[in-house]
């Protein structure tokens, strides 16, 4: 099923397997190239399974055949109570129920491997379609219809004029913040194999003869290894190891593709002048990270860890810049006679000689009469010295390095070597401007209660323990600020200046952080510069946000930062906890209202606001297409800046493939620009006012319905019984515990990710839709709801996301999970609300079944459903057997471990099939 995180266009093809056994009717609609690749992958997988165990292959084919038939029965509606013989889902249940635990583990692996291959083929096809579209674009066209960013910029020019459009372009900023939230159920070893299989599949299309035969052999080897590799990691990653996620994405995509984003925009705006004149596109991509710095509820993230991760990031980007500087420099072989160096460049060379004659003599020896090359080679050596912390040669800041690059660029331009000035050298400048010497801006986060407790401890026992020993957590809090300061000293203020307070309740929470920052240092000059960011997460906090901000700007440290930054201020909004706290409908509307009120408040105080969106990948955590989310924001809340969290499976889906990474960044940048277009601002303002009464009524009814469910006596233990919540907590997919610290005792303490993840695994997706059906039923005005869907971007995006979530639910499977709990009253509430919500969503969008008019996405979900069903059946049977036999004390420790491992295998497989976790 196509990931919830990506906007689906006709370029995004559905996936289906074919081969021996029953075929789904949708296969006839598959593009030939996609079908061919899927045929190849399934053929190889079946051969791999046969080589491993013929009985396993036979069982795989048998389950697959009945699962496909069961899916046809579900979608065609031929299954009725009077025709039970055609219930092929029950046949799947009967087959799987007779398989022993060990063989069930292998069967789960087989289907999980299939999903990895299916996802890969889908991704490859999307890339090929994008390439085909771009190849078909006429160079004479005013804009590139495939490049959303150029389309958005031209719309701004048409509506506002070239000058104002350029002003907005220069203000453009996209801040993705990569987090270690444990929502990627694939282990890294699996990701590496998937990447290699992707490369082999691409090569397979181009090769022939013996080369193709060798490529096929390697493809067999990789798919065989993928099947034989446990989908479950051997241990949880450490926070330092989690940083490798960013390093992988940096190496494989970001470092090289982000300059391509800038270059593609320049190519269409400047036309034939691109690469011959100074660039138009600013370096607007500013990545951040919580990995190694988010300590909210994660005791594994310490001050020592933060220092290690910061050093890891810095050394890695410096190494990449060194390699690129040397590569670009070696190609600047222009002689002084043809390309005379400028006086400014000669001055830089003399400065380098004063710094180290050894380096300049070495460079001059290599590059006689090639001063541009010689200067660049010394710059590369200085980057190496920066990694080694050589005080005599190192760069003090990235700004100094960029200044040297621009000196070389100006010299080349003055010598009329413009292609050299604005070619690869400009790409290098963009890389330095984007990633700096820090790679990502580390953002620290901690719970507000931790700060208040630390201050209470200090007041009781004294800063240095004069009246008794301080608590270990207090020492850690103070060490955190010292770590932040040391990172700033090494890599610059930009490397780590943001400190986020989760569960911000009052301005006092802000004061606490500034006070602790001061107390951590003996000398005032050592106190680091920080921007404290309130994070409003729960419904009540969102409603009180403006009052808190009003008090916050009275704090002297905040006033000083506002003055120093020209009025810049950042506020974070939490989509996850607000959804678990209030339900999806109320959370969506409360967040929109809070953004609107905060934007108006900021404007009244002349504050340059950035709203930071703490969105997850799943719809229940604010997920969905990022570009549509931007366009639905209230007026004044974006201002050409968009910042959001990116995590887990979202990082891999959006940035794992270079072509798709470019598309994603361009798409978000386009929406961020368009949000300032007068036509978009007017539409959002007018529609928000027009449908305010409707929104208020939906909010109240949905909220009451959601709370009625959560407040039902015994809900929390029932929830953990009818979902694999406990088992998900055992998955080694992140260093962070599934529950918050501070004494987690209830559903309130449960993190939102396992809340979402568990409902998705049970094929219910309750967190994405519960309460909306009742709200629509009580509102009753279908015409108004339909009109709002057509006119109001916020509502249409919300309804479309819910329709997609409903399409991934399966009432037949859901009933099997709900049967694990002995609560008919709760079962009825969930199933009744699911049916009611589906009925109203279909009425609103005008569909007879979910995603009827979103053919590509609907087909993708429908085609993948049978294989997810097979894994879901395996999972729910294992859960039922495990819990029943544990209660009766019938299992040995080893048997219990085998059942648990089977469940974890199915969790990984279902996540791969659904392509979302939390």
Where are these regions (language model features)?
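Active-site-proximal structural scaffolding
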Residues: 38, 56, 104, 243, ...
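Ligand-binding clefts of soluble mixed alpha/beta catalytic domains
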Residues: 571, 603, 645-781
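Catalytic or ion-translocation cores adjacent to nucleophile or general acid/base/metal-coordination motifs
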Residues: 15, 301-332, 520-700
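Short glycine-rich or small-residue beta-strand-to-loop segments that form or flank ligand, phosphate
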Residues: 112, 408-411, 498-502, 532-535, ...
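C-terminal accessory/interaction regions of large nucleic acid-associated machines
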Residues: 720-918
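Often metal-dependent polyanion-binding catalytic scaffolds in large enzymes
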Residues: 2-462, 473, 530, 623, ...
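Conserved alpha/beta core surface patches that mediate binding of polyanionic ligands
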Residues: 269-287, 479, 510-515, 547-559, ...
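Active-site cores of enzymes that catalyze phosphoryl transfer or operate on phosphate-rich substrates
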Residues: 367, 373-375, 385, 417, ...
């Amino acid at each position: 099923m196509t990931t919830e995180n990506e906007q689906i266009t006709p370029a995004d093809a559905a996936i289906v397997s074919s081969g021996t056994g029953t075929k789904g009717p949708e296969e006839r609609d598959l593009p030939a190239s996609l079908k061919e690749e899927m045929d190849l992958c399934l053929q190889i997988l079946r051969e791999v399974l046969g080589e491993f165990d013929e009985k396993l292959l036979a069982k795989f084919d048998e389950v697959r055949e009945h699962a496909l038939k069961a899916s046809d029965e579900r979608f065609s509606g031929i299954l009725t109570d009077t025709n039970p013989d055609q219930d092929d889902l029950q046949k799947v249940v009967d087959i799987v129920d007779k398989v022993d635990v060990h063989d069930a583990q292998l069967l789960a692996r087989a289907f999980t491997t299939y999903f990895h291959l299916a996802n890969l083929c889908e991704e490859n096809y999307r890339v090929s379609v994008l390439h085909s579209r771009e190849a078909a674009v006429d160079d004479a066209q005013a804009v590139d219809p495939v490049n959303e960013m150029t389309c958005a910029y031209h719309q701004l020019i048409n509506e506002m004029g070239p000058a104002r459009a350029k002003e907005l372009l220069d203000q453009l900023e996209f801040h993705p913040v990569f987090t270690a939230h444990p929502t990627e159920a694939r282990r890294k070893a699996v990701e590496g194999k998937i990447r290699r299989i992707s490369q082999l599949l691409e090569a397979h299309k181009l090769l022939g003869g013996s080369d193709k035969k060798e490529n096929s052999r390697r493809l067999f080897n990789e798919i065989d290894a993928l099947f034989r590799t446990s989908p479950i990691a051997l241990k949880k990653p450490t926070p330092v190891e989690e940083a490798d996620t960013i390093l992988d994405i940096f190496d494989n995509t970001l470092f090289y593709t982000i300059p391509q984003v800038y270059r593609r925009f320049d190519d269409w705006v400047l036309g034939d002048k691109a690469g011959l004149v100074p660039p138009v596109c600013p370096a607007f991509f500013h990545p951040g990270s919580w990995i190694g710095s988010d300590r909210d509820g994660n005791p594994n993230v310490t001050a020592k860890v933060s220092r290690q991760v910061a050093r890891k990031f810095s050394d890695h980007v410096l190494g990449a810049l060194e390699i690129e500087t040397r590569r670009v420099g070696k190609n600047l072989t222009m002689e002084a006679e043809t390309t005379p160096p400028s006086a400014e460049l000669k001055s830089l060379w003399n400065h380098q000689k004063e710094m180290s004659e050894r380096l300049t003599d070495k460079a001059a020896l290599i590059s006689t009469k090639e001063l541009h090359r010689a200067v660049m080679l010394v710059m590369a050596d200085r980057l190496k010295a920066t990694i080694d912390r050589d005080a005599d040669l190192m760069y003090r800041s990235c700004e100094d390095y960029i200044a040297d690059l621009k000196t070389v660029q100006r010299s080349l331009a003055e010598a009329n070597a413009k292609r050299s000035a604005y070619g690869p050298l400009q790409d290098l400048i963009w890389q330095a401007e984007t990633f700096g010497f820090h790679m990502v801006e580390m953002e620290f986060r901690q719970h507000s209660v931790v700060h208040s407790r630390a201050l209470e401890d200090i007041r009781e026992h004294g800063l240095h323990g004069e009246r008794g020993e301080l608590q270990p957590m207090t020492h850690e809090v103070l060490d955190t600020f010292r770590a932040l300061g040391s990172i700033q000293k090494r890599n610059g203020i930009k490397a780590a200046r943001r400190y986020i307070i989760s569960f911000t309740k009052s301005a006092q929470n802000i004061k606490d952080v500034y006070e602790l920052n001061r107390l951590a240092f003996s000398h005032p000059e050592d106190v680091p510069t920080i921007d404290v960011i309130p994070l409003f997460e729960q419904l009540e906090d969102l409603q009180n946000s403006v009052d808190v901000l009003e008090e916050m700007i009275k704090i002297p440290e905040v006033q000083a930062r506002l003055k120093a930054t020209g009025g810049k201020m950042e506020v974070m909004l939490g989509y996850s906890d607000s959804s678990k706290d209030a339900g999806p409908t109320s959370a969506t509307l409360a967040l929109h209202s809070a953004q609107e009120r905060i934007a108006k408040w900021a404007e009244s105080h002349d504050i340059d606001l950035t709203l930071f969106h703490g969105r997850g990948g799943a719809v229940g955590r604010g997920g969905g297409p990022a570009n549509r989310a931007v366009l639905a924001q209230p007026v004044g809340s974006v201002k050409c800046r968009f910042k959001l969290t990116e995590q887990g499976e979202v990082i891999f889906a959006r940035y794992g493939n270079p072509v798709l990474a470019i598309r994603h960044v361009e798409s978000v940048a386009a929406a961020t620009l368009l949000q300032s277009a007068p036509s978009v601002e007017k539409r959002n303002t007018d529609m928000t006012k027009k449908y305010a009464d409707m929104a208020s009524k939906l909010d109240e009814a949905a909220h009451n319905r959601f709370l009625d469910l959560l407040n039902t006596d015994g809900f929390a233990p029932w929830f953990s019984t009818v979902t694999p919540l406990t088992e998900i907590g055992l998955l080694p997919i992140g260093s962070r515990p599934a529950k918050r610290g501070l004494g987690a005792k209830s559903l309130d303490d449960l993190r939102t990710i396992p809340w979402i993840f568990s409902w998705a695994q049970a094929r219910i997706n309750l967190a994405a839709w519960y309460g909306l059906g009742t709200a629509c039923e009580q509102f009753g005005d279908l015409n108004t709801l339909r009109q709002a869907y057509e006119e109001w971007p916020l509502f249409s995006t919300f309804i479309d996301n819910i329709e997609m979530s409903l399409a991934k639910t399966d009432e037949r499977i859901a009933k099997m999970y709900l049967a694990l709990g002995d609560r008919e009253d709760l079962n009825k509430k969930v199933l009744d609300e699911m049916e009611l919500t589906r009925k109203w969503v279909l009425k609103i969008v005008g569909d007879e079944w979910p995603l009827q008019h979103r053919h590509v996405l609907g087909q993708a979900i429908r085609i993948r459903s049978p294989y997810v069903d097979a894994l879901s059946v395996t999972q729910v049977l294992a859960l039922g057997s495990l819990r029943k036999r544990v209660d009766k004390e019938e299992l040995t420790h080893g048997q219990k471990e085998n059942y648990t491992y089977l469940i974890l295998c199915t969790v990984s497989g279902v996540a791969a099939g659904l392509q979302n976790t939390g």
